[in-house]
């Protein structure tokens, strides 16, 4: 496994995302299979696990918590996210955070993100009336969050405005980064902007949920002409 240093941590370059998990014929999460995947990942050096409130119809955190509970707490780093992008009623960060800790069966999160700060929810995240960011900054002070960051699919003006206001509080940012989104979602410009704020970048969707590993044959043939030994997935890996 390849590792990268983040502050005083040694993180696996490959993380274990749980937005998509194996399911049974009736659509439930196949927990035995998921457990085997988690065990295999840890045994082979993966130590970063990413979940979120909304993943797998709000069940990902619960299943991930059960799977990781079987391993020593200091053998993995766990990240989850506050669902500001899906709120349909008044925000209650304290209640949501308490539920997340219960579902994940932990007393702290190694990494905690504001989920998808973008044009449609940035006002919720930043409104002093709700105090969302202030609440999580306080949880970090109390040790219940070790590192606070955010994920985003925002356009550049929105991202710029958010960083101007809260960049000092954000320790890392997760963006969609692959050779397609380098231009499609302006990942290049987002990387440049985040670098100006000295904010480390986390990569999500490096192969776009597998789509960049399963290209049409015509596209695969073109890539094969340039690098016969390379798979479609390896192109995504080397350009992300």
Q: In which residue ranges do the predicted regions lie?
A:
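Conserved, mostly hydrophobic/aromatic
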Residues: 14-16, 41, 49, 64, ...
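Beta/alpha (TIM)-barrel catalytic core signal, keyed to glycine-rich beta->alpha loops juxtaposed to Asp/Glu
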Residues: 117-240
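N-terminal binding-site loop/beta-alpha segment at the start of enzyme catalytic domains
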Residues: 1-76, 135, 141
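Active-site groove signature of glycoside hydrolases
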Residues: 101-124
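Active-site mouth loops of central-metabolism enzymes
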Residues: 20-32, 81-92, 120-125, 154, ...
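Short, acidic/polar
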Residues: 28-41, 89-105, 154-165, 232-237
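A short, structured active-site edge motif that brings together acidic residues
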Residues: 74-86, 112-115, 175
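Acidic (Asp/Glu)-rich catalytic clusters
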Residues: 6-10, 42-43, 65-75, 98-107, ...
């Amino acid at each position: 496994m390849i590792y990268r240093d983040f502050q005083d941590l040694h993180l696996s370059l490959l993380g274990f995302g749980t937005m998509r998990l194996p399911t049974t014929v009736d659509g439930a999460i196949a927990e035995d299979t998921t457990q085997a995947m988690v065990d295999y990942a840890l045994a082979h050096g993966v130590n970063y696990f990413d979940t979120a409130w909304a993943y797998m119809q709000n069940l990902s955190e619960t299943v991930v918590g059960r799977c990781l509970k079987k391993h020593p707490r200091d053998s993995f780093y766990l990240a989850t996210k506050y669902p500001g992008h899906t709120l349909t009623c008044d925000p209650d960060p304290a209640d949501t955070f308490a539920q997340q800790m219960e579902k994940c069966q932990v007393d702290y999160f190694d990494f905690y993100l504001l989920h998808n700060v973008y044009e449609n929810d940035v006002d919720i995240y930043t409104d002093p009336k709700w105090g969302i960011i202030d609440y999580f900054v306080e949880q970090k002070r109390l040790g219940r969050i070790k590192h606070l960051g955010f994920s985003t699919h925002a356009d550049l003006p929105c991202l710029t405005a958010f960083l101007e206001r809260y960049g000092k509080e954000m320790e890392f940012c997760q963006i969609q980064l692959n050779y397609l989104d380098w231009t499609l979602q302006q990942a290049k410009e987002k990387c440049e902007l985040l670098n100006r704020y000295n904010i480390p970048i986390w990569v999500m969707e490096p192969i776009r949920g597998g789509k960049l590993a399963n290209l049409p044959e015509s596209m695969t043939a073109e890539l094969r002409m340039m690098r016969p030994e390379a798979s479609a997935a390896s192109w995504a890996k080397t350009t992300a």
